Protein backbone atom coordinates (compact mmCIF):
# COMPACT_ATOMS: atom_id res chain seq x y z
CA UNK A 1 0.00 0.00 0.00
CA UNK A 2 1.23 3.43 -0.90
CA UNK A 3 0.19 6.49 1.01
CA UNK A 4 -1.73 9.26 -0.68
CA UNK A 5 0.53 12.01 -2.00
CA UNK A 6 0.37 15.42 -0.41
CA UNK A 7 -0.62 18.43 -2.48
CA UNK A 8 2.89 19.80 -3.02
CA UNK A 9 4.15 16.31 -3.96
CA UNK A 10 1.44 15.99 -6.61
CA UNK A 11 2.34 19.40 -8.01
CA UNK A 12 5.99 18.39 -8.30
CA UNK A 13 5.17 15.07 -9.97
CA UNK A 14 3.06 16.80 -12.63
CA UNK A 15 6.27 18.30 -14.03
CA UNK A 16 8.02 14.93 -14.45
CA UNK A 17 7.23 12.24 -16.99
CA UNK A 18 8.60 8.93 -15.76
CA UNK A 19 7.55 7.01 -18.89
CA UNK A 20 9.19 9.10 -21.62
CA UNK A 21 12.39 10.52 -20.18
CA UNK A 22 15.40 11.11 -22.39
CA UNK A 23 19.08 10.81 -21.64
CA UNK A 24 21.20 13.39 -23.42
CA UNK A 25 24.63 12.13 -24.36
CA UNK A 26 26.36 15.48 -24.01
CA UNK A 27 25.24 15.69 -20.40
CA UNK A 28 26.86 12.33 -19.61
CA UNK A 29 30.07 13.45 -21.31
CA UNK A 30 29.92 16.72 -19.41
CA UNK A 31 29.56 14.91 -16.09
CA UNK A 32 32.43 12.60 -16.98
CA UNK A 33 34.71 15.59 -17.69
CA UNK A 34 33.55 17.40 -14.54
CA UNK A 35 34.43 14.37 -12.43
CA UNK A 36 37.67 13.51 -14.18
CA UNK A 37 39.22 16.97 -13.86
CA UNK A 38 37.48 17.85 -10.55
CA UNK A 39 35.79 20.95 -11.95
CA UNK A 40 33.82 22.57 -9.16
CA UNK A 41 31.75 24.87 -11.34
CA UNK A 42 29.81 23.79 -14.38
CA UNK A 43 30.30 27.30 -15.81
CA UNK A 44 34.01 26.57 -16.25
CA UNK A 45 33.18 23.59 -18.45
CA UNK A 46 30.71 25.58 -20.54
CA UNK A 47 33.26 28.40 -20.93
CA UNK A 48 35.94 25.92 -22.07
CA UNK A 49 33.43 24.36 -24.45
CA UNK A 50 32.59 27.77 -25.95
CA UNK A 51 36.27 28.65 -26.35
CA UNK A 52 37.10 25.35 -28.02
CA UNK A 53 34.11 25.72 -30.34
CA UNK A 54 35.26 29.25 -31.26
CA UNK A 55 38.81 27.99 -31.97
CA UNK A 56 37.50 25.21 -34.22
CA UNK A 57 35.18 27.63 -36.03
CA UNK A 58 38.00 30.13 -36.58
CA UNK A 59 40.29 27.40 -37.90
CA UNK A 60 37.55 26.20 -40.25
CA UNK A 61 37.03 29.73 -41.59
CA UNK A 62 40.78 30.18 -42.09
CA UNK A 63 40.96 26.88 -43.97
CA UNK A 64 38.18 28.07 -46.29
CA UNK A 65 40.36 30.98 -47.45
CA UNK A 66 42.74 30.45 -50.40
CA UNK A 67 46.11 29.01 -49.37
CA UNK A 68 48.12 31.84 -50.93
CA UNK A 69 46.18 34.54 -49.11
CA UNK A 70 48.48 36.66 -46.90
CA UNK A 71 45.79 37.12 -44.26
CA UNK A 72 45.32 33.36 -43.97
CA UNK A 73 49.05 32.81 -43.51
CA UNK A 74 49.39 35.52 -40.85
CA UNK A 75 46.19 34.67 -38.99
CA UNK A 76 46.82 30.92 -38.96
CA UNK A 77 50.39 31.45 -37.72
CA UNK A 78 49.13 33.76 -34.95
CA UNK A 79 46.39 31.30 -33.96
CA UNK A 80 48.76 28.34 -33.86
CA UNK A 81 51.34 30.33 -31.88
CA UNK A 82 48.70 31.34 -29.33
CA UNK A 83 47.37 27.78 -28.99
CA UNK A 84 50.89 26.36 -28.69
CA UNK A 85 51.84 28.93 -26.04
CA UNK A 86 48.72 28.00 -24.07
CA UNK A 87 49.61 24.33 -24.42
CA UNK A 88 46.43 23.35 -26.25
CA UNK A 89 48.17 21.92 -29.33
CA UNK A 90 51.37 19.82 -29.31
CA UNK A 91 53.10 21.58 -32.25
CA UNK A 92 52.71 24.60 -34.49
CA UNK A 93 52.16 22.29 -37.47
CA UNK A 94 48.93 23.01 -39.29
CA UNK A 95 45.37 24.17 -38.80
CA UNK A 96 44.15 20.57 -38.63
CA UNK A 97 45.49 20.46 -35.05
CA UNK A 98 42.86 23.03 -34.09
CA UNK A 99 40.13 20.44 -34.70
CA UNK A 100 41.40 18.48 -31.70
CA UNK A 101 41.06 21.39 -29.24
CA UNK A 102 38.29 20.47 -26.81
CA UNK A 103 37.14 21.46 -23.35
CA UNK A 104 39.36 18.67 -22.01
CA UNK A 105 42.35 20.41 -23.60
CA UNK A 106 41.64 23.45 -21.46
CA UNK A 107 41.09 21.25 -18.40
CA UNK A 108 44.53 19.67 -18.91
CA UNK A 109 46.10 23.14 -18.55
CA UNK A 110 44.43 23.93 -15.21
CA UNK A 111 46.79 24.36 -12.27
CA UNK A 112 45.78 21.20 -10.32
CA UNK A 113 46.26 19.05 -13.42
CA UNK A 114 49.68 20.61 -14.05
CA UNK A 115 50.59 19.90 -10.40
CA UNK A 116 49.68 16.28 -10.98
CA UNK A 117 51.76 16.20 -14.17
CA UNK A 118 54.76 17.71 -12.35
CA UNK A 119 54.31 15.06 -9.61
CA UNK A 120 53.79 17.67 -6.92
CA UNK A 121 50.59 15.87 -5.86
CA UNK A 122 49.54 12.24 -5.90
CA UNK A 123 45.87 12.78 -6.69
CA UNK A 124 43.88 15.47 -8.41
CA UNK A 125 41.76 15.97 -5.32
CA UNK A 126 44.88 16.67 -3.25
CA UNK A 127 46.17 19.04 -5.93
CA UNK A 128 42.90 21.00 -5.83
CA UNK A 129 43.17 21.19 -2.04
CA UNK A 130 46.79 22.41 -2.21
CA UNK A 131 45.81 25.18 -4.62
CA UNK A 132 42.76 26.27 -2.62
CA UNK A 133 44.73 26.35 0.63
CA UNK A 134 47.42 28.58 -0.88
CA UNK A 135 50.36 26.17 -0.94
CA UNK A 136 51.19 26.77 -4.62
CA UNK A 137 52.57 29.77 -6.45
CA UNK A 138 53.10 30.45 -10.13
CA UNK A 139 56.06 32.75 -10.51
CA UNK A 140 55.93 35.28 -7.66
CA UNK A 141 52.13 35.13 -7.23
CA UNK A 142 50.26 32.77 -4.92
CA UNK A 143 47.33 31.23 -6.79
CA UNK A 144 44.26 30.02 -4.90
CA UNK A 145 41.95 29.51 -7.88
CA UNK A 146 41.96 25.93 -9.26
CA UNK A 147 40.64 27.25 -12.60
CA UNK A 148 43.93 29.08 -13.26
CA UNK A 149 45.27 28.11 -16.70
CA UNK A 150 49.03 27.55 -16.82
CA UNK A 151 50.81 28.40 -20.07
CA UNK A 152 53.82 26.48 -21.36
CA UNK A 153 56.20 29.26 -20.35
CA UNK A 154 54.78 29.51 -16.81
CA UNK A 155 54.79 25.75 -16.26
CA UNK A 156 58.45 25.88 -15.17
CA UNK A 157 57.64 28.45 -12.47
CA UNK A 158 55.03 26.36 -10.61
CA UNK A 159 56.42 25.74 -7.14
CA UNK A 160 55.52 25.64 -3.46
CA UNK A 161 55.09 28.82 -1.44
CA UNK A 162 58.15 29.50 0.75
CA UNK A 163 56.13 29.44 3.97
CA UNK A 164 54.35 26.18 3.08
CA UNK A 165 54.66 23.19 5.41
CA UNK A 166 54.59 20.94 2.35
CA UNK A 167 57.73 22.60 0.99
CA UNK A 168 59.37 22.14 4.37
CA UNK A 169 58.50 18.42 4.43
CA UNK A 170 59.75 17.92 0.86
CA UNK A 171 63.06 19.62 1.66
CA UNK A 172 63.47 17.56 4.84
CA UNK A 173 62.79 14.37 2.93
CA UNK A 174 65.37 15.27 0.28
CA UNK A 175 67.79 16.43 3.01
CA UNK A 176 68.05 19.88 1.41
CA UNK A 177 66.45 21.90 4.20
CA UNK A 178 68.32 25.01 5.25
CA UNK A 179 67.20 26.31 8.64
CA UNK A 180 68.26 29.87 7.83
CA UNK A 181 66.03 30.14 4.73
CA UNK A 182 62.91 28.63 6.25
CA UNK A 183 62.90 30.58 9.51
CA UNK A 184 62.68 33.96 7.76
UniProtKB/Swiss-Prot annotation:
* UniProt key word Transport: no
Which GO MF terms does the UniProt record name? RNA binding; rRNA binding; snoRNA binding
> Taking every annotated instance into account, which residue ranges of this chain make up the domain S4 RNA-binding?
109-175
Q: Which residues form the signal peptide?
A: none
Write out the annotated subcellular location: Nucleus, Nucleolus
Query: Keywords of this protein's UniProt record, alphabetized?
Result: Nucleus, Ribonucleoprotein, Ribosome biogenesis, RNA-binding, rRNA processing, rRNA-binding
Its domain of life reads Eukaryota
Q: For this chain's UniProt record, which GO biological process terms are given?
A: maturation of SSU-rRNA; ribosomal small subunit biogenesis; rRNA processing
CDD domains according to UniProt = S4
Provide the Gene Ontology terms for cellular component: cytosol; Mpp10 complex; nucleolus; nucleoplasm; nucleus; preribosome; small-subunit processome
Family of the protein in this entry: Belongs to the universal ribosomal protein uS4 family.
* Assembly, per entry: Part of the small subunit (SSU) processome, composed of more than 70 proteins and the RNA chaperone small nucleolar RNA (snoRNA) U3. Component of a heterotrimeric complex containing IMP3, IMP4 and MPHOSPH10. Interacts with MPHOSPH10.
Q: What does this protein do?
A: Component of the 60-80S U3 small nucleolar ribonucleoprotein (U3 snoRNP). Required for the early cleavages during pre-18S ribosomal RNA processing. Part of the small subunit (SSU) processome, first precursor of the small eukaryotic ribosomal subunit. During the assembly of the SSU processome in the nucleolus, many ribosome biogenesis factors, an RNA chaperone and ribosomal proteins associate with the nascent pre-rRNA and work in concert to generate RNA folding, modifications, rearrangements and cleavage as well as targeted degradation of pre-ribosomal RNA by the RNA exosome.
Protein's name in the database: U3 small nucleolar ribonucleoprotein protein IMP3
Identify the gene encoding this protein: IMP3
